[in-house]
């Protein structure tokens, strides 16, 4: 049996401002740091440490990953940064407050851009585009160590986590779109040798934003 833990980054400054943060490389807030350390402490209390850890290339996931690893592994492991895990490119929505975007383009239009599978915001990515880069990463980089019985940590973003869970849990598109990931809230999977899920546990730490 192996262990896979997937965590969204702690609260970022973009989250705190209510923005479509996307590919903007914003730091964690103090609350985000606290959430991340708390997530690591909860995982350590479950007896979990990691053999390999991945983050996106964006600072908010790198710092969240380091804060978690400091609790579970000390300073013995450094996250591997992968651009495949980067947050969705929101195109023209990037950096805009969500309420301002709804006023500018209309709530229904913005909701389609956010939650349809194949319609991207202007100049940005759809969730289908994200799955096209995340699922190959999952197969080539995450599944092999799990098959060797290793413990793997992945710290990513709300939209890339949708695609990760789509692949791990074999979800339908509808179920994939329904996923909401609170900040710094680990999902712990116990994985069998055939990559089926033995047990799944959600550990609530942060908030959905």
Swiss-Prot record:
It comes from the Bacteria. Its EC number is 5.4.2.11. SMART domains: PGAM. Disulfide bonds: none annotated. Homodimer. This is 2,3-bisphosphoglycerate-dependent phosphoglycerate mutase. Belongs to the phosphoglycerate mutase family. BPG-dependent PGAM subfamily. Substrate binds at residues 8-15, 21-22, 60, 87-90, 98, 114-115, 158-159. It is an enzyme of class 5 (isomerase). The keyword Isomerase applies. GO terms for molecular function: phosphoglycerate mutase activity. GO terms for biological process: gluconeogenesis; glycolytic process. It catalyses: (2R)-2-phosphoglycerate = (2R)-3-phosphoglycerate. The record marks 157 as: Transition state stabilizer. Pathway: Carbohydrate degradation; glycolysis; pyruvate from D-glyceraldehyde 3-phosphate: step 3/5. NCBIfam families: pgm_1. Catalyzes the interconversion of 2-phosphoglycerate and 3-phosphoglycerate. Keywords: Gluconeogenesis, Glycolysis, Isomerase, Plasmid. The active site is at residues 9, 87.
């Amino acid at each position: 049996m192996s262990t896979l833990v997937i965590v969204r980054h702690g609260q970022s400054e973009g989250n705190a401002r209510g923005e479509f943060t996307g590919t903007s490389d914003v730091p964690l807030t103090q609350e985000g740091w606290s959430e991340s350390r708390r997530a690591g402490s909860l995982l350590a209390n479950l007896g979990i440490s990691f053999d390999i850890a991945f983050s996106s290339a964006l600072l908010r996931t790198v710092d969240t990953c380091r804060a978690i690893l400091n609790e579970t592994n000390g300073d013995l492991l450094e996250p591997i940064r992968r651009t495949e895990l980067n947050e969705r490119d929101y195109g023209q929505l990037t950096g805009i407050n969500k309420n301002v975007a709804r006023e500018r383009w209309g709530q229904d239009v913005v909701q389609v851009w956010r939650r349809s599978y194949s319609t991207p915001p202007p100049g940005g990515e759809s969730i289908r585009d994200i799955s096209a880069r995340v699922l190959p990463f999952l197969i080539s980089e995450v599944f092999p160590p799990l098959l060797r019985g290793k413990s793997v940590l992945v710290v990513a973003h709300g939209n890339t986590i949708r695609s990760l869970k789509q692949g791990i849990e074999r979800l339908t598109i509808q179920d994939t779109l329904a996923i909401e990931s609170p900040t710094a809230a680990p999902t712990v999977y116990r994985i069998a040798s055939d990559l089926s899920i033995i047990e799944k546990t959600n550990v609530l730490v942060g908030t959905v934003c």
